[in-house]
């Protein structure tokens, strides 16, 4: 009873999460958005099944199809059947293809496994499903999955695939098998190589009119033997003897979700002879084949891998001004998971780059992780029907603006605070952008060093700053006073690298102010252009005012 209650709660939570992400559209707009995406997916399907070509990556197709289904459920439409081929000249399957239900996570899989025994895990091979019918020991018919009840006659094509046994004996002599035709790979590592659009490539080869030698690049993985031997071990042995060796090699007994997770992770990183997109867990005990129907298999489930790239909805476009005054564009996203990382924002780059991408709220973009786990945009895979793009701020900022706070300087001013607190500058540990915003909003800083005047009481009474953290911050701010002179000059944004600044041997503000352009130009990595920037910087009125203020605070190197 407890198990069923847990399953019910899990389902309700899943339904709640679906409704929580329903778009806030009017009925008219919902109809338009659903219709447009439905038409696009239908166009992709037509090309896929009629010409054997894929105009879109498998992963993008799957995720946009799921997005369409979600929208249809949100607005009361009938969800479409995904990847349903035309049924001209279709052949009945002796045993229906049931399909496989997907588990959202390990917990859901664990709940499913608790009620079952004699369980086995197999790789979820990424290809196209097929029925193989053997009669009197010979391959009699090969049928594409189709809609699960009917499919296309693929007998001629499959007979040319050398990996498919044309004759069998013993219990298999009069049998029906279900499996996956896949693209044979040598040492395919899913974690590194991804899906390589394998499903579309296999479909393309099977749909071509010419019987080319390329069919020998295909293999078959049998995952079901309806009405076969009762024991899984007997099934695997007979299949291996007949030539279906991969099934025995890649089918393992499992007792719980932890064991499945270990195998799943192993196959994710291992060299395999095929592309996979997860694992399938199945019970050895299956109902008689006459009870098999599409979408009604309770004896097996899939636990798919997380896609290397995820389709994410753009919720908003935001503009940020960096410490140098450059405007960058950030897309705020509906949260997606990438490699156990929750991604809600992705940097687009400059305003020009954003305009080239042509991204607006409501668009669907493909996001992946670049080096060091930084999210990046790979493509814009779908644009909404109604697109309103925000106006970027005026390009009025530069490297010498916003040392002092003002309404128009809000973003660049905060960026300067974040910069000066960094480890390589003043090393103010424990405070980031959110903390600086909280301090500035409460205490209305005059300039980028106003935080030096904050008292322990002021820090303790700052909304958004925990009382336990306020004492630590006050200690950090006091320690900053003892930082070397060069660190403070870096905090002021001098346009030099740390190496060049250290090589200058400048030890005081007065010495720095009297240094000439020729002096700066001689420093390593500093040309005439950079030297002129240093002169402009030190002669700027805001910089001079900050220097005088730091002198009054008796900061090292600034004293008269």
Curated annotation (Swiss-Prot):
Role summary: Catalyzes the formation of phosphodiester linkages between 5'-phosphoryl and 3'-hydroxyl groups in double-stranded DNA using NAD as a coenzyme and as the energy source for the reaction.
Reactions listed under catalytic activity: NAD(+) + (deoxyribonucleotide)n-3'-hydroxyl + 5'-phospho-(deoxyribonucleotide)m = (deoxyribonucleotide)n+m + AMP + beta-nicotinamide D-nucleotide
The keyword Aminoacyl-tRNA synthetase appears for this protein: no
Protein family (similarity comment): Belongs to the NAD-dependent DNA ligase family. LigB subfamily.
Name by which UniProt lists this protein: DNA ligase B
SMART domains according to UniProt: LIGANc (SM00532)
Alphabetized InterPro entries for the sequence: DNA_ligase_AS, DNA_ligase_B, DNA_ligase_CS, DNAligase_adenylation, DNAligase_N, NA-bd_OB-fold, NAD_dep_DNA_ligaseB, NAD_DNA_ligase_OB
Top-rank taxon, per record: Bacteria
Positions annotated as active site in the UniProt record: 124 (n6-amp-lysine intermediate)
Gene assigned in the entry: ligB
PROSITE patterns for this protein: DNA_LIGASE_N1, DNA_LIGASE_N2
Organism: Escherichia coli O9:H4 (strain HS)
